Amino acid sequence: MIDGKYTADYLWQEKGIVPILKIDKGLAEEKNHVKLMKPIPNLAETLKHAVEDRHIFGTKERSVIYDYDEQGIRDVIAQQFDIALQVWNAGAVAIIEPEVDIHNPHKAESEAFMLEVINEHLAKLDSDVKVMFKLTIPTVNNLYTGLMKDPHVVRVVALSGGYSQDEACHLLSLNHGMIASFSRAFAQDLRYQQSDEEFDATVKAAIAKIYAASIA
């Protein structure tokens, strides 16, 4: 707790930060050039507690696509949407995160096919269902512009995926409407040896750079 409030309540009420809960339990072994999520035990109970008792707004769940493989990509997206519907039915909004590895030798083709499959699943959703997406910055600029306009989609955010901070920000700036959800790139210059002043200055500089790329 923080100042007598549960963390999620403090984040939203005091800081205006939407609370998100990571619910996946890591990645399964690679098959068909992808890694699905491992089974998530007691998901229904976790979601009920998160939403009703802790006021969590959304969830995050990650899988990875390493190469172009239609069956693998279909499996990833099917699993993501299955979990997303369970999250929605529990009263929260899922962040669907099918990361396309930046070293994928057929990254552009994988992203294009993934988008086709995503659109197939979106078309089957009831009109009231909402989801978010956290995606690798695409090889083809503005690939996800149409996805952002889908009425089911609350937001499309970008993961840094192993790109350096400079490169991630540059690539993001070329994709209008995508905003950063960087962790690796955000933290790349932080060191435990830094003084409080150095740490704070590094954080502020990263935020400024990433924010500028998000609104470009």
Model-derived segments and spans:
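Eukaryote-skewed repeat-based solenoidal scaffolds used as protein-protein interaction platforms
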Residues: 59-137
